[in-house]
Amino acid sequence: MSRIGKRAVAIPSGVEAKIDNGTLTVKGPKGTLSLGLSDLIDYKIEGDEIAVNPANDTQKARSYWGMQRTLVSNLVEGVTEGFSKTLEISGVGYRAQAQGKTLKLQLGYSHDVDIAVPEGLEVKTPDQTTVIISGIDKQAVGQLAAEIRQWRKPEPYKGKGIKYQGEYVFRKEGKKK
């Protein structure tokens, strides 16, 4: 039995949810998100909460149960509060600058790296070594953060690179003579 799946997702005031044609659509103060529903799971809107239960007692349905409940929860949280990820850049000459719908990174390559910001996401650079990505879709926010980090992952000897805020970089000792 899924301990996550058996809890219903509360719908706060100001948020509207509806199910039609295999799609759950959630509207809130920050925007609208939708989720394609799985046939293995039953979704019911009961008053001010969304109940998620397996459609049958197969192993596959039970394994989807908790994940589908979390995806529904992320829709509701996204349209009410939104999501954000913070990246920290460390290294000599490494810097970032947001220019409209483009993020310009200087990461020690012979050229600047320009990353296009997808629709629905916002990128801010409060200073040259911090990048804040925010939006209502948790998957899109995490994907953009991962793509930015991919350009220079933190290296273990000096700790240079792009890392998530709060990420621990395992450090190694250099060669000894």
Curated annotation (Swiss-Prot):
The keyword Amino-acid biosynthesis does not apply. Keywords: Ribonucleoprotein, Ribosomal protein, RNA-binding, rRNA-binding. Pfam families: Ribosomal_L6. Signal peptide: none annotated. It comes from the Bacteria. Part of the 50S ribosomal subunit. This protein binds to the 23S rRNA, and is important in its secondary structure. It is located near the subunit interface in the base of the L7/L12 stalk, and near the tRNA binding site of the peptidyltransferase center. Belongs to the universal ribosomal protein uL6 family. This is Large ribosomal subunit protein uL6. The gene is rplF.
